[in-house]
Amino acid sequence: IRKIFGNNKYPILIDQEGGRVSRLKNLISFDNLTSEFFGKKFINKPKEFNSFYKLFIDKTSELLKLIGVNINTSPVLDLRVKGSSNIIGDRSFSYNPKIVSKIGDFCINNYHQNGIATVIKHIPGHGLAKVDSHHFTPVVNKKLDYLRKKDFFPFKKKNSIFAMTAHIIFKKIDAQNTVTHSKKMISLIRKKIGFKNILISDDLSMKSLKNSISQ
């Protein structure tokens, strides 16, 4: 691919969070190293968290560079929310937005130091979804004031090069469109959350998106 484009830094992306979202299971097993696992380390054993999570990121980075990948769709900055779909579940660091934000910064900074670009997801937050967006369209009814203090909070002031949008409808802001298709939500991400870098979409084949690409 890079020879075709004449660019040895041409962006090649992978979804390698660790835990149950691992595209390299045939090469290395990260099944038990979930975001939830590291979130608990952060709370209960902070010194151990620093060394252990850094080692995890370093080893992941080494593997990605070995196979020629320079972008990882990590970290997940969605909150863990009781009663919501398990599509996020242990992929989240915590129920606490401040903890998620701090671990997110740690993850982003360490990947960047290793020469791997990050993709924070699923902006502006997937935690409140009660259905799996791979199969249905989640609708969130919370008001903006609540969302800004909770689900949107971990995405603020992040220096990630990329962010991935959530295929969710936030009914109080745009009742018709998922974030990915919503001018109102994209404006909110840019102006209220303050993310100015590159936005990319989650999988366009997911059932949460309706209509054709032209629409």
Can you say where each PLM-predicted feature lies in the sequence?
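Second-shell residues forming the walls of enzyme active-site clefts
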Residues: 1-3, 102-106, 111-112, 116-215
